[in-house]
Design a protein with these regions (language model features):
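Post-HExxH zinc-binding segment in Zn-dependent metallohydrolases
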Residues: 303-334, 339
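Primarily auto-inhibitory N-terminal propeptides
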Residues: 25-170
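Ordered, small/hydrophobic-rich secondary-structure cores
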Residues: 30-51, 272-304
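Active-site-proximal segment of zinc-dependent metalloprotease catalytic domains
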Residues: 136-142, 147, 154-155, 159-296
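Non-catalytic extracellular/lumenal accessory regions of secreted precursors
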Residues: 330-375
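Bacterial N-terminal signal peptides
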Residues: 9-20
Length: 375
């Protein structure tokens, strides 16, 4: 059973339990949480870029509690995060960004829509590849940019020079898209759109107007983020699958965007690997840290085959079912409720189309013929 089928089956199961009176006292999986205004970030200048661990703690010194407060954590919680996860780095302004370290690039593999755990939805006409929208008209947007960009005046331009981020490319011709590339982009978009389906957000491959991404003020309720899917060469020197700033989705500046995903490090553009990385990096923009254990920064999941599971903010490359989490596995070192945190950074849930109680749930109707009942 792939991820989409799991997601379709679970609401029906929950509804059946509620109607039968056996669901217990548990509430819905994700209650609505208000968008929380953040305190202003303290004015800090650090002597070096990308400090992590104890070095980052030492550099912040007496300013650490202020930075921790900005990220919604106590000083001790913030210290614990820096010490347990070396992928969390401080830039010279004291802002956190994450570098998804890997020992080496993931090996290239062949991924098709029939592979267990992959979406099996149909494709749109290929000339619509860069016009895909999951929820047009939503006030929040996640733009998946496969076409490349010139980065100027962003946090990634720490050297001051402009950066040329090349388009998604599988055939060595980066400024044109062949059939395989267009199909791959559509399947990647399907996967990411599925991950964000519970939210009132438009996941799109279309280059939308900047005012749908950039937030002009704290009263502007139309904003989003961009994930740029590019080659790491000439953009960011690392052996990593991506980089992203933490908790910048609702910033009133686009300085800390976009998030970057490096397809050339991810199985040479493997559909599943790239999609998982996109959802993961966008999650960092929305305030999420890694789901790991006491011995690993990333939890790679449990089980195997069609019943294998992993959290999106861990490592989802190798499991069929990959979901948002709040640390529902043995040895979890991060109990963030992903749904609650993302909402607090301005990503609202969709309005539920069916109630969560016996009084508000939709009545199941059916018919009977020849002794066989159908719903």
């Amino acid at each position: 059973m792939n991820r989409l089928r799991h997601l379709l089956a679970l609401p029906l199961l929950a509804l059946g339990l509620a109607l039968s009176g056996t669901a217990g006292a548990a509430g819905p999986a994700a209650d609505h949480v208000p968008h929380t205004a953040k305190p202003p970030f303290p004015q800090i200048t650090l002597p070096e870029h990308a400090a992590h661990g104890q070095r980052a703690i030492d550099l912040l010194g007496s300013r650490l509690p202020e930075v921790a407060n900005f990220y919604g954590k106590s000083a001790d919680e913030f210290k614990g995060l820096l010490l347990r996860d070396r992928t969390h780095r401080l830039d010279k302004r004291g802002r956190l960004f994450i570098v998804e370290e890997m020992d080496k690039p993931l090996a290239a593999t062949t991924a098709t829509a029939s592979t267990p755990g992959l979406l099996d939805g149909s494709l749109q006409p290929l000339d619509q590849t860069f016009l895909l929208h999951s929820r047009p008209g939503a006030k929040r947007t996640i733009y998946l940019n496969f076409k490349g960009a010139t980065l100027t005046g962003t946090a990634w331009n720490s050297s001051g020079a402009s950066l040329t981020a090349l388009p998604f490319d599988l055939d060595g011709l980066p400024y044109s898209f062949n059939t395989t590339e267009l199909q791959r982009i559509q399947y990647i978009w399907q996967r990411v759109a599925e991950d964000y389906a519970p939210f009132d957000v438009d996941v799109t491959t279309e280059a939308v107007p900047l005012d749908l991404i950039n937030r002009s003020s704290s009263t502007d309720d139309v904003f989003g983020t961009t994930v740029l899917i590019t080659n790491s060469t000439g953009v960011y020197s690392c052996s990593c699958g991506g980089v992203a700033y933490l908790g910048v989705f609702d910033d009133t500046s686009d300085f800390y965007k976009p998030a970057l995903v490096f397809y050339n490090q991810l199985g040479a553009g493997n559909e599943k690997y790239v999609a998982e990385a996109i959802s993961h990096e966008a999650g960092h923009n929305m305030g999420l840290s890694h789901d790991g254990t006491a011995t690993a920064n990333y939890y790679s999941g449990q089980g195997s085959g069609t019943t294998g599971w992993a959290p999106i903010m861990g490592v989802g490359y190798y499991q069929a079912l990959v979901q948002w989490s709040k640390g529902e596995y043995t040895g979890a070192n991060n109990l963030q409720d992903d749904y609650a945190v993302m909402q607090s950074y301005g990503l609202p849930l969709r309005t539920d189309d069916h109630g969560n109680t016996a009084a508000t749930a939709t009545l199941l109707t059916g018919s009977a013929s020849g002794g066989i009942s159908t719903l």
